[in-house]
Amino acid sequence: ELAVVQSAGAILQWDMETKMPPKGVELKSQQLAFLQKIAHQMLTSQEAGKVLDAIQKDSEYDSLDQVQKRNVYLARKAYDEATKLPEELVVDIVKQQTVGVNVWKKAKAVKDWKLFMPELVKIKELTEKKAELLMDIKGAKTPYDALIDDFEPKMTADNITRIFDGMRKGLTKVMDKVLEHQDVDTGFLTRPVPVPVQEKIGEQMADFILYDIKSENACGRIDTTEHPFTTGYYTDVRITTNYHENQFMSSIYSILHEGGHGLYEQGLPMKWMYQPIGSSASYGIHESMSRFIENM
């Protein structure tokens, strides 16, 4: 039931970004906040806590297989973290994110950053409250580490710095070699390509990578949005792109990139559907799948 509620929220977010009329933002924020409220109540219920306690204390716990133990671990992690967050804060974050995205679109359209700044500050303040509340249960040294764990479990800012410092040494050498060759004619990249033509190319690229949007058993679709993203769950995973007539490669790369995300989500084992383990491992893994398709 929790997975169903969360997947319903994902599709509502997709609607907000793709099909929602301008006047619908307030209603959409209420809808998303309500679903988040239900999900939070399900996660933090006394019954959920009692069930987890009973499972972990049961004499048969050690006989569970690896997948079963992983499910228990992930359920316990979600429960422990959710119980540290007040329902009001959880709801406020979702509402502000919804309003913030809408204002960001308007600010981007008129190229006025100041329009978005107040909403970004509100999101930042709410997120800081969340991070501070989660530090202890996550064993994080800093609020930022607590937030990183949401996206890349067990990762820290110190480890990221160490990894990036190591990568920089090799990448700098590669960039130096690239910069030695700047006499390449890239004029074709800005040649005007009508949007309908780009759409056909995008559909062909999706078909090439086996992201199905056409068959009677299709689990995907491609829509237009301000900023490309992927959302959905197992048999309904949707991607978006945007089109610029003078930058046709933008839509191609985004379809390949988001298609990679979509294929990863659709490729999760069906036997894990509705289980805690039946979700993406981390954002790092997710991005590796999307960049593999995009770059290869």
Predicted regions and their residues:
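Active-site recognition of the HExxH zinc-binding catalytic motif
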Residues: 135, 243, 250-270, 287-291
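Secondary-structure transition/capping motifs at alpha-helix termini
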Residues: 208-217, 262-271, 296
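Active-site-proximal structural scaffolding
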Residues: 28, 164, 195, 245-248, ...
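Short acidic (Asp/Glu) and glycine-rich catalytic loops that position anionic groups and cofactors
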Residues: 9-16, 75-77, 180-181, 235, ...
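Post-HExxH zinc-binding segment in Zn-dependent metallohydrolases
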Residues: 279-296
